[in-house]
């Protein structure tokens, strides 16, 4: 029996050429091998593999349960990706010509470029940070044919947030940021307490609802029936709170600025609630990001900064964002937005919260190093690759816009997402491998890796070329483009494997996959050098880059944690996380050590970050697990 799939004639011709040119290995890397396209073969392979990540053509550490739901979701991915590539090729050909379409398909197939979430790339956007203002004022306004009304109490509002997260998560492929969740939860909580609706302990009431929300977003079938909802919650120091919410009002018309102290206290309650829950039930979401103003050598809101750093000592579960201006903001596990550059900054507060990305397409920087004769050749090739990447992203954006016009993405019609507030994102990976290939790294007598001065300068030139090329490209466009150092959950291994096939004598294979840090976590170096390099290149990544600073154990003292955080901020590193290994028993209690203090059971798995948020190592792919075993961990308590 033959099943007809109608594809563009030109695309079919080029697709067949790619299969012939690159062979079975690359077909499998792309998810287009016979066994991946065959549903029966896929089912057999899925059953035999240890984890979903090893069976998927586009794995995610957030998908941990291997069951019928994940089987049914993963099975058609190759076909969805094939249809998406057909659409992109067709539209690229129309807008930029036949040669450009062919160049893209070759670059994507050979893994010079990597389009993330490719199977949904023409169907839904990547990520967005949503304001909950309308939800707080009107209720479930996004549900069609539903007579909605506003929440009157905290419990109802939390239920509304759960529905909101489920709705938005299923209409995007990436994160759902909730930067103003805390002020609105505080509003409903304080009204319930002050009105006498809730007459028992107010703290208990708050913590119960915080727990309800955390358990809901970690329910493993909220998104696409196979994974929990990738959510991020923001916490701010006083200068940020004033800047972002100073011009905003609660649903009853009361200015948020009048409740600044209450909002600050509720932030602390939420963070403490998250911390307590981890001991009982280790979880992944929401990702917590704490933003501080650090200026002239000190934290402006030192009281909150000290409280937050002390709080973070237990689990190191918050990502820390420092800036000398409120025009920069973190909305995601690594997403960093320069609000002024992106045109979304409002001095009276509020509008800066709604920002996101349409799609991410990554440039394999290591590949260019293997192709190049020297630095100048590298930079010329890089410029061409960036231009091609920008054309692809522009085309995908056009397709998403058409989907909106056809009413296929109601989250845009509802006003939840504004396409004008989303940028296209150039992903990068392979900075370390590029420097190693050029001979721009060195070892000290203790085996620590350092970047040479040539690496520092070459890195600057690489980022300058990327930035100048994208700025030139968008001169006649009505949107912005950002640069992001990607997590590379799935991409890092596939790109390295492709380069190993094509450049077996040149490929840098210090680790089983390419690093998602400027110095990968499996490469031995000093904490100071890791911070120095991240500080040097961090500012170029206006779409996100987070430095992971691996600790073999939590800080012993607040003074150590405080001094280290101040040092990092003083070096100009804006976004970072102290990363630990959190053990979990079979009952999912979080702890440090070999035996669970709650139930006495031994370690069943460990939680740590790939990028941005903690996930159980047992759900990772084989290559990721190998990389985890090779990671270096700093002893900060010696």
Predicted feature residues:
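Contiguous, well-ordered alpha-helical segments that form the cores/surfaces of helical PPI scaffolds
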Residues: 183, 424-437, 609
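Glycine-centered flexibility sites
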Residues: 427-430, 543, 612, 623
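Conserved catalytic cores of very large enzyme subunits
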Residues: 2-420, 441, 447-452, 456-597, ...
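Core of folded catalytic or high-affinity ligand/protein-binding domains
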Residues: 419-420, 424-428, 617, 625
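Short amphipathic alpha-helical leader/targeting segments
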Residues: 247, 403, 438, 445, ...
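Intrinsic, low-complexity terminal and presequence regions
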Residues: 581-638
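Metallocofactor- and cofactor-centric catalytic cores in central/energy metabolism, strongly enriched
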Residues: 204-207, 211, 215, 437, ...
